[in-house]
Amino acid sequence: MKLIVGLGNPGNEYRFTRHNAGFLAIDKICEKLNISLNKEKFNGEFAVSDGFILAKPLTYMNKSGDFVYSIASFYKINPSDIIVIYDDLSFSIGQAAIKIGGSSAGHKGIERLMSKFSSNDFKRIRVGIGVNSGTTIKDYVLSLFTKDEMIVVEEVLEKVADAAISLVYNDVNFVMNKFNTDNKKRVI
């Protein structure tokens, strides 16, 4: 069993903010697979499908690791079988990449996951939200995408959704080679 989890903040006021790239990716996967997150437990919402669980924490970003740890423990999912989709300030909008392990790079949601699991062994799909220009990081990640940015974000989320689904059924190196080559080059 694999766990695909998107990080973000709950509530409509955050729905289309940069920090909710992970939630937007989960929405895209649900749309592609005609799945709805129909279970609520562990302070999150999720759906159990054939071979994987699709999930969103209902906590704020900085506490999202609590939900991920609880659901993974309940379903006996190892960190190496977790796929986390989240926003990344170091990538331009339209860029995305799969990564295994590494540091949190200051991302509070990833820091919490690493702390809860005492591991960084999970797979990550990093979705570019653009480089902060002249505002605080908090204000930037909580800002809305512009209309033009959202068009590009929608395009990359299609590929992110396909990559996440592919990671459930295929070798991570195969998926990384295919996805990372295509998506790290794109710049808005």
Swiss-Prot record:
The UniProt entry, under CDD domains, shows: PTH
- Pfam (any one): Pept_tRNA_hydro
| Keywords tagged on the record | Cytoplasm, Hydrolase, RNA-binding, tRNA-binding
Recorded catalytic reaction(s): these are: an N-acyl-L-alpha-aminoacyl-tRNA + H2O = an N-acyl-L-amino acid + a tRNA + H(+)
Q: Name one GO cellular component term.
A: cytoplasm
GO terms of biological process kind: protein quality control for misfolded or incompletely synthesized proteins; rescue of stalled ribosome
Localization per Swiss-Prot or TrEMBL: Cytoplasm
EC class name: hydrolase
Which Enzyme Commission number(s) are on file for it? 3.1.1.29
Check the record and name the SUPFAM superfamilies matching this protein: Peptidyl-tRNA hydrolase-like
- What domain of life does the UniProt record list for this protein's source? Bacteria
Single annotated GO MF: tRNA binding
Give the annotated active site: H19
- Site keyed Stabilizes the basic form of H active site to accept a proton: positions: D87
Which residues participate in tRNA binding? Y14, Y60, N62
Q: Where is this site: Discriminates between blocked and unblocked aminoacyl-tRNA?
A: N9
Q: Which InterPro entries match?
A: Pept_tRNA_hydro, Pept_tRNA_hydro_CS, Pept_tRNA_hydro_sf
Q: Which NCBIfam families match?
A: pth (TIGR00447)
Summary of subunit composition and partner proteins: Monomer.
Q: What does this protein do?
A: Hydrolyzes ribosome-free peptidyl-tRNAs (with 1 or more amino acids incorporated), which drop off the ribosome during protein synthesis, or as a result of ribosome stalling.
| Record-stated family | Belongs to the PTH family.
Q: What is this protein called?
A: Peptidyl-tRNA hydrolase
Q: Which organism does this sequence originate in?
A: Mycoplasmopsis agalactiae (strain NCTC 10123 / CIP 59.7 / PG2) (Mycoplasma agalactiae)
Which gene name belongs to this protein?
Answer: pth
